[in-house]
């Protein structure tokens, strides 16, 4: 299935975990994204989680909810989440949700 490839290229660099998210994220596959990210965070407690969204042309509010939950989980462990390479539509959605400033 498509969902297996949602999160790729996961690697750890010092105390940072880097991962790339791929594809449009919406109600159908945001639960898969959530599962992937929470599993990653169960295995590791990174000081920084850096998510490359270059290959995410679109996400809906369910995907944003997953990102916020991920952020809260990482912050609880004293870490930070960074979203990089945002495409315009995704950036616009985060701005509308007034979230563009919390993922920095």
State what each model feature region is.
Residues 24-103:
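Amphipathic alpha-helical interaction surfaces in cytosolic regulatory modules
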Residues 1-20:
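Short beta-strand/loop segment at the start of cytosolic alpha/beta domains
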